[in-house]
Amino acid sequence: VLAEVHEHDGYPVNWPDSPGAWLTPPSLIASWVAELDGRVAGHIGLSRSGVGDAAPGLWSARAGLSIDATAVVNRLFVAPWARGHGIGALLMGQAVAEAQDRGLHPVLDVLASDTAAVVLYERLGWQLLATVEQQWSPEQKVTVRCYAAAT
């Protein structure tokens, strides 16, 4: 499904050498897969803050709490054929509930150019913390929107 999403939407922007490892980083707390009609239709992960995550630091500075009080929602994608069924919102709800059950505040970073994701997050009530520039490599600079789940 990840390859299908990458071909259709360009996500992830940089195709990983090992898609399985990309989906299960060492910082992973939990992940979920959605199925529709017996087929994998989507995925989401929940991780501890890592290098390059801007949203945890922004939220912790605003909240006056440690960055360790956050959980990063990441690796959300829905197969193109499965869109329009609420799968993205369902997966987001699961990740948010898990973070909150662990006493963590959910945050996320998203490319500003990923307008479908931005629309989903804002429709779900996520609050924009900031828009920042990130240097992903010497030749790749991107604009990222940082969000926190509503309190």
Where are these regions (language model features)?
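Conserved active-site alpha-helix within GNAT-family acetyltransferase domains
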Residues: 89, 101, 113-130, 138-140
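Active-site acidic-Proline motif in GNAT/NAT acetyltransferases
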Residues: 79-81, 85, 112-113
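Residues within well-ordered alpha-helical secondary structure of globular protein domains
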Residues: 1-4, 123
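Conserved GNAT acetyl-CoA-binding A-motif
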Residues: 99-111
